[in-house]
Amino acid sequence: MLLKRRLFIAASLFAMHLSPALAADAVSFAPQPPAIDAGAWVLMDYTTGQVLTAGNEHQQRNPASLTKLMTGYVVDRAIDSHRISPDDIVTVGRDAWAKDNPVFVGSSLMFLKEGDRVSVRDLSRGLIVDSGNDACVALADYIAGGQPQFVAMMNSYVKKLNLQDTHFETVHGLDAPGQHSSAYDLAVLSRAIIHGEPEFYHMYSEKSLTWNGITQQNRNGLLWDKTMHIDGLKTGHTSGAGFNLIASAVDGQRRLIAVVMGAKSSKGREEQARKLLQWGQQNFATVQILHSGKKVGSERIWYGDKEKIALGTEQDFWMALPKAEIPHIKAKYVLDRKELEAPIAAHQQVGEIELYDRDKLIAQWPLVTLESVGKGGMFSRLSDYFQHKA
């Protein structure tokens, strides 16, 4: 039973990872989102993972070359685990050569040739910048011994990242029965890439790549938009998928991720992603509300070797909120017992911290003791007994 409430903050600091139900409440006071002309879309706050607006976000759709995000993610995990090195030299096999390969007809290529010797780093650039299907195959052969084995690795990371709408059948994203993902899952994957690939993520912002005397431009036209600070991620297109785009924009210390699937044209996908990102930047703030180890209040503790105990949280918590709601944010902590009695250990949960927008609960976090309090001496405990029972 929750017995004590204390008001300790009246907004201008906030945020964190919260439950889906509370996350929806957190944006319930947001301004009207833009109308998006696409099959599915998501705007996600990078820091918190909160979805700020979305449409058909869990609809299973053809990812096309957005599949290559998972290909690159698996490559980076292999590097992290020291199975391979970015400087390893890969000998390109025949199945990665477009010549006489009907699978690659009319598709995006790095223009590798059988027998080429290319570093893992350069193949990764070819995968990301050129969207090279041949680069995907060369990397899959090198890391897993073949495409089916590499696809199995991709799907193992689907499970690890809890991508419930996603299944891969190819390493490159060309149309294949049973291959699908969703705008939401691709936003989650993009967030994992940005967080987990600091040495490779810069490749997503490269505007061109020259290989074998051929210079190709990155198909993400938003990289040239100087007003948006876009630094990734990827485009995709097949006749079955339509025009897909994932774009990430940095605004000061904030980052947003926009996913657009099934747009009508390459320019159309850029326009829809731009609308989402601009709306998010204009209307939301991502701020820290709680600091790990920082006291949010203190309470009387009975029968201890001190009279007060400091309370707070063990983690840093962030949250994305509509800017217009900042003046209306308040937080309280609530004890889960009538009184606190010693001895009590540090890091013990004794209640909850509650965040309100106006009168609406939008987030909760554990309230814990920040210090231990031992049992007091006989005379202090006796004094506490008479005070407590009075």
UniProtKB/Swiss-Prot annotation:
InterPro entries: Beta-lactam/transpept-like, Peniciliin-bd_prot_C_sf, Peptidase_S11, Peptidase_S11_C, Peptidase_S11_C_sf, Peptidase_S11_N. It catalyses: Preferential cleavage: (Ac)2-L-Lys-D-Ala-|-D-Ala. Also transpeptidation of peptidyl-alanyl moieties that are N-acyl substituents of D-alanine. Its EC number is 3.4.16.4. Keywords: Carboxypeptidase, Cell inner membrane, Cell membrane, Cell shape, Cell wall biogenesis/degradation, Hydrolase, Membrane, Peptidoglycan synthesis, Protease, Signal. Pathway: Cell wall biogenesis; peptidoglycan biosynthesis. Its main location: membrane. SUPFAM superfamilies: beta-lactamase/transpeptidase-like (SSF56601), Penicillin-binding protein associated domain (SSF69189). GO terms for biological process: cell wall organization; peptidoglycan biosynthetic process; proteolysis; regulation of cell shape. SMART domains: PBP5_C. Transmembrane segments: none annotated. GO terms for cellular component: plasma membrane. Substrate binds at K234. It comes from the Bacteria. It is found in: Cell inner membrane. Residues 1-23 form the signal peptide. It is a peripheral membrane protein. The active site is at S65 (acyl-ester intermediate), K68 (proton acceptor), S131. NCBIfam families: PRK11397.1. Removes C-terminal D-alanyl residues from sugar-peptide cell wall precursors. Belongs to the peptidase S11 family. This is D-alanyl-D-alanine carboxypeptidase DacD. The lineage of its organism: Bacteria, Pseudomonadati, Pseudomonadota, Gammaproteobacteria, Enterobacterales. The gene is dacD.
